[in-house]
Amino acid sequence: MALNEQDVARIARLALIELPPDQRGRAQAELNGILHLIERLQAVDTQGVEPLAHPLSAHEDITLRLREDAVSEQATEARRAELLANAPESADGLFLVPKVIE
């Protein structure tokens, strides 16, 4: 699948990226390169290959040092207020962020 210039303009508009017409050719080439790599990956036969939880688990001699998922500090109203003091805007104990999807 190859993208044309209109496809690139549409993708830029949907992603809310300002892409001047003189840069569309370069973006088109880069996106088409990425799509080509994806097509090559999809062509690889993975039948019978056991899924990995982590890429390093394919090597038996490597031990992963993953930390335990444990609470490291207790949540308190004072701690919440301290963290929210760093936020540009907050409401009802939550961070407010700009809307990114129209």
From Swiss-Prot:
The keyword Acyltransferase does not apply. Keywords: ATP-binding, Ligase, Nucleotide-binding, Protein biosynthesis. Its EC number is 6.3.5.-. Pfam families: GatC (PF02686). InterPro entries: Asp/Glu-ADT_sf_sub_c, GatC. It catalyses: L-glutamyl-tRNA(Gln) + L-glutamine + ATP + H2O = L-glutaminyl-tRNA(Gln) + L-glutamate + ADP + phosphate + H(+); L-aspartyl-tRNA(Asn) + L-glutamine + ATP + H2O = L-asparaginyl-tRNA(Asn) + L-glutamate + ADP + phosphate + 2 H(+). One of its GO terms (molecular function) is asparaginyl-tRNA synthase (glutamine-hydrolyzing) activity. One of its GO terms (biological process) is regulation of translational fidelity. Belongs to the GatC family. Heterotrimer of A, B and C subunits. Allows the formation of correctly charged Asn-tRNA(Asn) or Gln-tRNA(Gln) through the transamidation of misacylated Asp-tRNA(Asn) or Glu-tRNA(Gln) in organisms which lack either or both of asparaginyl-tRNA or glutaminyl-tRNA synthetases. The reaction takes place in the presence of glutamine and ATP through an activated phospho-Asp-tRNA(Asn) or phospho-Glu-tRNA(Gln). PANTHER family: GLUTAMYL-TRNA(GLN) AMIDOTRANSFERASE SUBUNIT C, MITOCHONDRIAL. This is Aspartyl/glutamyl-tRNA(Asn/Gln) amidotransferase subunit C.
